[in-house]
Amino acid sequence: MTSADKNNPDTSTAQGSSADLGVTVPKGFSAAAVTAGIKPSGKSDMALIRNDGPDDIAAAMFTRNQVTAAPVRYTKANNDGTFRAVVVNSGNANACNGAQGDKDARATAEKAAELLGCQPGDVAVCSTGLIGDVLPMDKVLSGVDELAGKLDQSITAGNDAARAIMTTDLVAKEAVYHGDGWSIGAMGKGVGMMAPSLATMLVFITTDAHLPSADMAHEALAGATPTTFDCIDIDGATSTNDTVLLMASGASGITPDAEEFNAAIHQVCLDIAMQLQADAEGVTKRVSITVGGAETDADAQTAARVIGRDNLFKCAMFGSDPNWGRVLAAVGMAPVKMNPEAISVSFNGHPVCINSTGAPGARTVDLSGADIAVEVDLGVGEGRATVWTTDLSYSYVEINSEYST
């Protein structure tokens, strides 16, 4: 794939293109994946991404759940605008393990730092998997040793890393953005326990752009997450481990202007977010809920979340049932101002409720397709927001009822 003019950027996804994808597309990054034996399945379960420089700029966003996993606490404490590498394990969240969890997260970083020739604080640590089980540190430390010896700048190495961080994901999530002589790569995981504060997920973004300061990286990431990852709300649950990490190597030697860079980071975050929604646990319907006519954008987002979390609404979507009454019943519980007599609803562009009353043909709207767009107007203002969710299927219940067994 060739680079594109900055006014016509080239963006590809793991689901939409056979082009090179992932965290090793940008210059100055190495990656590796191994099977350390953490997952009972025997699948790969550890990954390492190293920023080979010359820069080591970084920015990160974390879960807002008050119960945080040890790797989140460790990485957050060392988030000073620089990271040289990140170690990731899947199959174990290292969450709710007390002092032992903190010790294990720190030991993981120390082992990686020793092998990579940097300080422990230069290494971010991320974990994903079952909460409450202590990490098998003999396997983790052996895995770090093996990872360091396998680091490679090939595209395949990045693809392997994307697969190694998967838990109940069915497919790896990767993306790439080509600017004018510089690029962005990304990989992510997460299909369940997805709600605001990034949704349950780990996302790693790399760029070979030269950023003058960590402030530029933070501004781009902080500006992108509210309208991308924070808008995914699959099941109303927020993970203890959510982390989005951006690392910049500067290897291209090119500094894009801030507006261009911010837009590119947003585009990549949106790309990964849509892949997360598409692979959500048990998903058969991808549902976008747009609420307008609210007093503020924040109110609109709150109302959209209330609808998206309503189990009766989600069941209706699973059954392709254009039951607009469930939308009204759900949104009526939102703690925002609305005109209860002037709410309008449409499914896939077809009005099904006007002024809180059923519209002609409402019961016959076809929702059999995989994508459903729900639009709601609260009738009191100009606020508008969109939240992405899914249906509630038999498979979702099956997957989550058997998760720890």
Curated annotation (Swiss-Prot):
Q: Which residues bind substrate?
A: T167, K189, T200, E281, N400, T405
What InterPro entries is this protein classified in? Arg_biosynth_ArgJ, ArgJ-like_dom_sf, ArgJ_beta_C
Keyword list (alphabetical) reads:
Acyltransferase, Amino-acid biosynthesis, Arginine biosynthesis, Autocatalytic cleavage, Cytoplasm, Multifunctional enzyme, Transferase
Q: Which pathway does it operate in?
A: Amino-acid biosynthesis; L-arginine biosynthesis; L-ornithine and N-acetyl-L-glutamate from L-glutamate and N(2)-acetyl-L-ornithine (cyclic): step 1/1; Amino-acid biosynthesis; L-arginine biosynthesis; N(2)-acetyl-L-ornithine from L-glutamate: step 1/4
Q: Which Pfam families does the UniProt record give?
A: ArgJ
The regions listed as transmembrane in this protein's record are none
The site feature described as Cleavage is recorded at: A199, T200
**Region spans: Disordered:** 1-21
Q: Which GO terms describe its cellular component?
A: cytoplasm
Name of the featured protein: Arginine biosynthesis bifunctional protein ArgJ
Query: From what organism does this protein derive?
Result: Corynebacterium jeikeium (strain K411)
